[in-house]
From Swiss-Prot:
Its EC number is 3.4.21.88. HAMAP family: LexA. Belongs to the peptidase S24 family. It catalyses: Hydrolysis of Ala-|-Gly bond in repressor LexA. Homodimer. The active site is at residues 157, 195. One of its GO terms (molecular function) is serine-type endopeptidase activity. Residues 26-46 bind DNA. CDD domains: S24_LexA-like (cd06529). This is LexA repressor. Signal peptide: none annotated. Keywords: Autocatalytic cleavage, DNA damage, DNA repair, DNA replication, DNA-binding, Hydrolase, Repressor, SOS response, Transcription, Transcription regulation. The keyword DNA-binding applies.
Amino acid sequence: MLTRKQFELLKFINERLKEAGVPPSFDEMKDALDLRSKSGIHRLITALEERGFIRRLPNRARAIEVIKLPDTGGMPGNSRRGFTPSVIEGNLGKVRPPSPTPAEDDHDRGSVAVPVMGRIAAGTPIEALQSRSHTISVPADMLGSGEHYALEVRGDSMVEAGILDGDMALIQKNDVADTGDIVVALIDEEEATLKRFRRRGASIALEPANAAYEVRILPPNRVRIQGKLIGLYRKY
């Protein structure tokens, strides 16, 4: 499953190769996808290469080869410009007492199947994922009401809040947050990170819980809340 940005970039590269015989420059890709910097293009290119859609040819400038295009199942549901994406899509876990849905291979009537929607960065923001991979079984009384999902934590920027690399973060879907909440924040509609949310005047601060990382101060129009942390699932 490709994200909307990944699909748009792959389509743009493929069309340019057909039209001109050479791939677009990074500046052209940045402008075509309305990104603020070329670092976002580097991340998208790497993601497409890792997924086997493109190949970068060594020792040649601007040498990108499109290996394949996604089939219908690998395309975003809506790839047109102006579409507002959500990093978390699909049917999320809901508590439906008194008969919660059991997780896969789990028949405990007191548990709920919570979908794992990908990985979340507790460190440098990583590209947002939109694919549901599997479910985990969570005690129903941990969740309360509303919709929930889980994200695998990658990084160590929240260790002082007790959130470790490899933990499964349990998230209540929400688009608002109070100061002090630990949230899933979508930055510039393309990167997701797990940080503590605070308001600083007219700006939003995304604070790590590790002195080795810096606080990010961003205008509200660059940040969209995707949910609030309600618990952790950890295997020993």
